[in-house]
Regions:
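A short glycine-threonine-serine/GTX helix/turn-capping micro-motif
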Residues: 150-156
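Divalent-metal (often Zn2+) His-rich catalytic cores of metallo-beta-lactamase-fold enzymes
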Residues: 159
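Extended, subdomain-level signal for the structured scaffold at the beginning of enzyme domains
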Residues: 1-99, 106-111, 117, 133, ...
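The feature captures the short pre-catalytic strand/loop hairpin that immediately precedes
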Residues: 139-147
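Short, glycine-/small-residue-rich phosphate/pyrophosphate-handling segment
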Residues: 114-132
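Structural detector of well-ordered beta-strand residues that form the stable sheet scaffold
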Residues: 99-100, 121, 140, 152
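Conserved beta-strand segments that form the floor/walls of ligand-binding pockets within enzyme
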Residues: 70, 121, 146
Length: 189
């Protein structure tokens, strides 16, 4: 199973490192064939928030077909304006079995039109902006994550860990998600 996490300049570090750790730990504990990777528009380093530099495993050009696709948040405003990014998000999210966003990554997924008429969430501070920009969404407050069909969106930053554990529960089982959380010494549920 290929799990891909989309990153970009000024992405929130915990938005991608938290889910990466959850899926990597779940893989190790299950001894399964999951491949967890970071994907960026190009193969060059990505400068996340706080100057954190990270090298993606893949670019848009060489990214394998994904089974689970996660779009992270951060300062997403420039990404919303990039037609190549939005087109790639549309293609990738349309061909992936499970699609998720962390924090303001919901804005990027909403821009694709694929969240139309869906229940979603995002960081508490951005919920009113998401609802104002994308009037065809139902923005749910006070939830760590919301699932509607194949789409799961999470609240801000650390909520991506909770959402990722929920996806592990769905993909393997709840016991394995609880074991993953315990291994990470993370209080979940």
């Amino acid at each position: 199973m290929n799990i891909g996490i989309y990153i970009y300049d000024d992405a929130e570090v915990l938005d991608f490192s938290g889910p990466f750790e959850v899926f990597s730990t779940a893989k190790r504990l299950a001894n399964n064939d999951w491949q967890v990777s970071l994907i960026a528009q190009t193969n060059g380093p990505v400068n996340a928030r706080g100057g954190f530099s990270v090298n993606p495993h893949y670019s848009f050009a060489d990214c394998p077909e994904l089974d689970v696709f996660i779009v992270v948040g951060g300062d997403h405003t420039h990404e919303l304006e990039k037609s190549a990014v939005i087109e790639w998000l549309i293609h990738t999210a349309s061909t992936t079995k499970r699609v998720a966003s962390v924090c303001t990554g919901a804005f990027l997924l909403a821009k694709t039109g694929l969240l139309c008429k869906k229940n979603v969430t995002t960081h508490w501070q951005d919920q009113s902006d998401l609802a104002a920009m994308f009037k065809d969404l139902t923005v749910i407050a006070n939830k760590r994550w919301v699932t509607d069909g194949k789409f799961t969106t999470s609240g801000g930053i650390s909520a991506g860990i909770d959402m990722s554990l929920a996806l592990v529960a769905e993909l393997i089982n709840k016991e394995h998600a609880l074991l993953t959380a315990k291994q990470m010494e993370y209080a979940w549920l």
